[in-house]
Amino acid sequence: VKAEDDTMMDAFKTGEINFLSQLSEGDQINTALDMAETGEFNYCHYTRNGYGKLMFQCDGGPTQFQAVRQAVAYLLDREEFATTFTGGYGSVVHGPYSTAQWMYQDSEEFFNDNLNNYSYDPAKAVEVLEADGWTLDAEGNEYSGTGLRYKEVTAEEAGDYALNVTLADGRILMPLHIMWASSENNPVS
């Protein structure tokens, strides 16, 4: 029987199910540990071989530009996110691997020393965007600090991105508007 996330703890308490695995949300883990403290249940702690990720479609729109992807990374407080989601039971990794995987364990020092961990830094996000040309408004004037940022792009860079603006002088401006998608039935989506 597969337990549903919103009822699995009650089903476990009542004996409807007798095993829980792969708990990753802090509230679930705390509830399970509280139940184990009563002595009625046992638990086994292990490093979970899983991870979450943010993925970009990089063949068009603003995310084709490395600076935009970097700015998004600087705007995510990944430490706070991991702590909030896992209740302090998770950690941040800087690539598509988990701390349970041997290749991470064998290379943890190298990863920590050589990969940019993109610590939360909104000022750095703005700096990266401005250096890449995201300095205009929708009319092609200097960005004032409110509304969307735009960048002048070539026709090739513009592609078929539906939100581009073509000015009377023929310049093409791309708005810094990212079309997001997310997985369903996910507490962080």
Spans of features found by a protein language model:
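Extracellular/periplasmic solute-recognition and catalytic clefts
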Residues: 1-60, 71, 79, 83-88, ...
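Short, polar/charged alpha-helical segment
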Residues: 31-32, 187-189
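Append "and occasionally in soluble cytosolic enzymes with long acidic Gly/Pro-rich linkers
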Residues: 64-188
